[in-house]
A protein has these predicted regions:
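Residue-level recognition of conserved beta-strand positions in structured domain cores
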Residues: 18, 67-68
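Conserved active-site segments centered on acidic
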Residues: 1-59, 124-132
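Phosphate-binding/catalytic loops
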Residues: 63, 69-132
Length: 132
């Protein structure tokens, strides 16, 4: 999402934070399979490390975007809010109700495709919603 926001020259208007609901990989860079797909699409991940989601994040952010129902439940337990969405909510006519975790599926291409579509649609929503 950061690279899309940067391409659209909106980095001064939109901040992106990527946070984890579990503490399993805190401080680690993206999975090697994720690194390969990001490299394939020339997306810089050099400053991306897993960080823990906090209650303060839920207060500070305008949108909380999750990948699946498990993440949704974790976030809602921390702070029930109407600003929590699954990324697939923004993909028109999406067959998937969640973003499959490539750690388990090993299908990094499908996950990238869905995340890319979702991020582009989410950005269009934000631009329209906030008159950017």
């Amino acid at each position: 999402m950061r690279h899309i926001v940067k391409e659209r020259n909106l980095e001064n208007k939109i901040q992106i934070f990527s946070k984890a609901t579990s503490n399993y990989n805190i401080g680690n860079p993206p999975h090697s399979g994720t690194q390969k797909i990001l490299t394939k699409y020339k997306i810089d991940f050099s400053n991306i490390y897993s960080e823990q989601l906090t209650k303060q994040d839920l207060t500070d952010c305008d949108y909380i975007i999750v990948m699946d129902d498990s993440n949704m439940n974790d976030v809602l337990k921390m702070n029930p809010s109407k600003k929590v969405y699954k990324l697939t909510d923004f993909i028109e006519n999406c067959e998937h109700t969640y973003i499959p975790d490539p750690y388990y599926t090993r299908n990094f291409d499908l996950t990238y495709e869905l995340v890319s579509k979702g991020c582009n649609s989410l950005l269009e929503h934000i631009i329209k919603e906030h008159n950017l």
